[in-house]
From Swiss-Prot:
A divalent metal cation binds at residue 101. The keyword Lyase applies. Belongs to the class II aldolase/RraA-like family. Divalent metal cation. GO terms for molecular function: 4-hydroxy-4-methyl-2-oxoglutarate aldolase activity; metal ion binding; oxaloacetate decarboxylase activity; ribonuclease inhibitor activity. This is Putative 4-hydroxy-4-methyl-2-oxoglutarate aldolase. It is an enzyme of class 4 (lyase). Its cofactor is a divalent metal cation. SUPFAM superfamilies: RraA-like. Keywords: Lyase, Metal-binding. Substrate binds at residues 78-81, 100. It comes from the Bacteria.
Length: 159
């Protein structure tokens, strides 16, 4: 089921003061600046094997929220993994961590928000957790929530 993007400012106006918006100032890296979808989560630290495995599955228009504990030491997503997500139907990635291949990411039809960049590769041991609540930017991302993202920020809605 595809969830259409909506302007996050309009969502905030509609929801009011109890809105769940991410306070973390993530940068826009993907070629799709507005995206929305059901949340799937991964928690991993400087290791991207688990998130690559998840992005290998059909995304059905979902958003993968990746909590890399804010580390900018290694990139969790680069052009190959982002293209894998795009090819498997994910609408976007929200990353509490770093990406690489930034100039190529801008050309891919997938939304990507992250803290910053680092050309260093991550490890690939498969360490991490999937489908668990993750928290960053003052908001908890729970699997099954709906994430809306645009140039103004990220809003999370529980259906």
């Amino acid at each position: 089921m595809t969830i259409e993007p909506r302007a996050t400012a309009d969502l905030v106006d509609d929801i009011g003061p109890d809105v769940r918006s991410c306070d973390l100032q993530l940068r826009q890296f993907g070629g799709r600046p507005e995206f929305a979808g059901r949340v799937t989560t991964v928690r991993c630290f400087q290791d991207n094997a688990l998130l690559k495995s998840v992005l290998s599955e059909p995304g059905d228009g979902g958003v993968l929220v990746i909590d890399g504990d804010g580390s900018l030491h290694t990139a969790l997503v680069g052009d190959v993994i982002a293209a894998l997500g795009r090819d498997n139907g994910w609408s976007g990635l929200i990353i509490n961590g770093a990406v690489r291949d930034a100039s190529t990411l801008r050309t891919l039809d997938i939304g990507i928000k992250a803290l910053g960049t680092n050309p260093r590769k991550s490890t690939k041991t498969g360490a991490g957790e999937r489908d668990v609540p993750v928290e960053f930017g003052g908001v908890t991302f729970t699997p099954g929530d709906v994430a809306y993202s645009d140039d103004d920020g990220i809003v999370i809605v529980t259906p």
